[in-house]
Amino acid sequence: MAPPAKRARRGLVPPGYKYLGPGKSLDQGEPTNPSDAAAKEHDEAYAAYLRSGKNPYLYFSPADQRFIDQTKDAKDWGGKIGHYFFRAKKAIAPVLTDTPDHPSTSRPTKPTKRSKPPPHIFINLAKKKKAGAGQVKRDNLAPMSDGAVQPDGGQPAVRNERATGSGNGSGGGGGGGSGGVGISTGTFNNQTEFKFLENGWVEITANSSRLVHLNMPESEKDRRVVVNNMDKTAVNGNMALDDIHAQIVTPWSLVDANAWGVWFNPGDWQLIVNTMSELHLVSFEQEIFNVVLKTVSESATQPPTKVYNNDLTASLMVALDSNNTMPFTPAAMRSETLGFYPWKPTIPTPWRYYFQWDRTLIPSHTGTSGTPTNIYHGTDPDDVQFYTIENSVPVHLLRTGDEFATGTFFFDCKPCRLTHTWQTNRALGLPPFLNSLPQSEGATNFGDIGVPQDKKRGVTQMGNTNYITEATIMRPAEVGYSAPYYSFEASTQGPFKTPIAAGRGGAQTDENQAADGNPRYAFGRQHGKKTTTTGETPERFTYIAHQDTGRYPEGDWIQNINFNLPVTNDNVLLPIDPIGGKTGINYTNIFNTYGPLTALNNVPPVYPNGQIWDKEFDTDLKPRLHVNAPFVCQNNCPGQLFVKLAPNLTNEYDPDASANMSRIVTYSDFWWKGKLVFKAKLRASHTWNPIQQMSINVDNQFNYVPSNIGGMKIVYEKSQLAPRKLY
């Protein structure tokens, strides 16, 4: 008789939690909430202390401080009690300064340490001290993971310790922490760490770092800009060229890391799609550090020369919209996220958002008589919404050497599969019984399969006939759906192409690829285009999804309710039959079978240009899927991060002048880094045969390595190569 299964020791853990309390083991499964997750991390750190010979129970450790930071905004009672317990311990217990070893991963990492300042700093400090200057204190920087938990998109966790005294050169106000001039405040890390857990789970920590360049805005004003290209849409047949809209252009810039290429290199993605079966999006955090602010002046000599000087008093404005009060503007749909190459400086995109503008455009074709109805309405006063960051979001001022951390945001999203389905409706359920089987190698059963079609048993929904065939037998549901494609609907703000979920169809013709809804991406040198290619024409690719949605437009037909065999031309509608008096238009262009019986997978991750997460609509009836991103945040999504150079004014500033204010030309370079955590399930093999995996041929290999002048590109990679059955 097998021994009884060994149960994990639960200890003194209150109901509703798995790790918040003493005396339990570390194999309790997934934490129940952010406070429980913080407790699990705290317990793992304590275990590391004990393995290294230190007793964390008698001292206040960095792990205790990390737990305090992560639970300071806790809304559950257990998190609040734990938070105040360790605050009390902090007040009475001696400090344990040494940090525990990090848990091992497939790529070992070292704890983040402050780099030592250069020797001339100490020489300067000694001179200033001798002259009577105050003693400069060095602030102790915690690693980025010490930021506050942000389960509801709360306020950013910024380090407010600032160095004081004249030796640092960056004293004064500001919302971020300060490392001081000449002292590094962070690390450059673009490693992807794979931590293999129990029961086939893998924790994937994607680290990303970029040098970000930011120029001062052209204007300090918000502008309402209306785009009007009625000259093009006034021509018959040009409805799809309509670009009329209104937008608010702001002086702010958006730091957007919401694209797969920001986080994973091609080798990482190959490993993930070849070995994992599904992805869970766990948490996200980001930080700005090592801020550099410089002014530009131009000499009066001929030819003029530019002089660049560090400005220790200029400010970088940083705002985190943690409560999602501003319009959500993911930049991946415009290919304007942070760049995909870690060693190349990148720029944040100018932030703008849509403003309401009514528009009427009546469809026409080249043979239409008369001028198209092409009305340029304007903004409805009832729908005016003008947002400003300055009075909606806390703004932090950073100077040279300062830093800013957002804290950790925990996602609430459904998982994303990394497998595709091959089954359509014709491959669901039990196949028909065969009376005879082939007797020779390679032989095929031709003709009748053993039982006359009108004598078979089973279930159909066909009236007026007793025939049961593979075409007429009733299946449990509809795999995929027929969607209108090349279909434009009219809204009060103009026509728009209706989105459809991507899926592989039948024959690979241009017509059918469009019908399958496969997205087509256009991008520049920051996002995968060959870096040495000249010209402004973007590079493009069409992502053909592996999953099968059951669409095959050129083979669809509709049969009359009075089912007749054979059918005549008056009781069947074929793809070649005219619709509305026009020929060559499939009924699939206008027919939608998406309904309560439809079975459909989520959209695939599109590496590297695809969007990762999206915001849930604030509507009562919500879409079940979004076509831009596989992860849809159920409650809140990470706050958008905005940056802007504060106005660096001259003595000629006149508040009554109508022209742009007089400013010193200023720009900033700062380092951005982030951490995006996933959990993935290892893919188990259930078939005898091996399967196709992500690989490359000899010619494609050289896309991923630099040429003799440094040219390289990123080729898109499939994400759902492994097949699976869905029924």
UniProtKB/Swiss-Prot annotation:
GO cellular component labels: host cell; host cell nucleus; T=1 icosahedral viral capsid
Start and end residues of each stretch annotated as Disordered: 1-40, 95-120, 141-184, 503-535
Region feature (Phospholipase A2-like): 19-64
Binding positions (Mg(2+)): 323
SUPFAM superfamilies: ssDNA viruses
Basic residues: compositionally biased ranges: 1-10
UniProt GO molecular function: metal ion binding; structural molecule activity
Cysteines engaged in disulfide bonds, as pairs: 633-637
Composition skew (Gly residues), residue ranges: 166-183
Motif Nuclear localization signal, residue numbers: 4-13
Pfam families: Parvo_coat, Phospholip_A2_4
Signal peptide: none
UniProt xrefs under InterPro entries: Capsid/spike_ssDNA_virus, Parvovirus_coat, Phospholipase_A2-like, VP1/VP2
Keyword Magnesium included in the entry's annotation: yes
Gene3D superfamilies, per database record: Parvovirus coat protein VP1/VP2
Keywords from the UniProt entry: Capsid protein, Clathrin-mediated endocytosis of virus by host, Cytoplasmic inwards viral transport, Disulfide bond, Host nucleus, Host-virus interaction, Magnesium, Metal-binding, Microtubular inwards viral transport, T=1 icosahedral capsid protein, Viral attachment to host cell, Viral penetration into host cytoplasm, Viral penetration into host nucleus, Viral penetration via permeabilization of host membrane, Virion, Virus endocytosis by host, Virus entry into host cell
Single GO BP term: viral penetration into host nucleus
Intracellular or extracellular location(s): Virion; Host nucleus
Functional summary from the UniProt entry: Capsid protein self-assembles to form an icosahedral capsid with a T=1 symmetry, about 22 nm in diameter, and consisting of 60 copies of two size variants of the capsid proteins, VP1 and VP2, which differ by the presence of an N-terminal extension in the minor protein VP1. The capsid encapsulates the genomic ssDNA. Capsid proteins are responsible for the attachment to host cell receptor TFRC. This attachment induces virion internalization predominantly through clathrin-endocytosis.
More info: The capsids of autonomous parvoviruses expose a proportion of VP2 N-terminus and part of that sequence can be cleaved of to form VP3.
Subunit structure of this chain's protein: Interacts with host TFRC.
Protein family: Belongs to the parvoviridae capsid protein family.
Comment on protein domains: The N-terminus of VP1 is sequestered within the mature capsid. It contains a phospholipase A2-like region and nuclear localization signals that might be exposed by capsid modifications during virus entry.
Protein name per the record: Capsid protein VP1
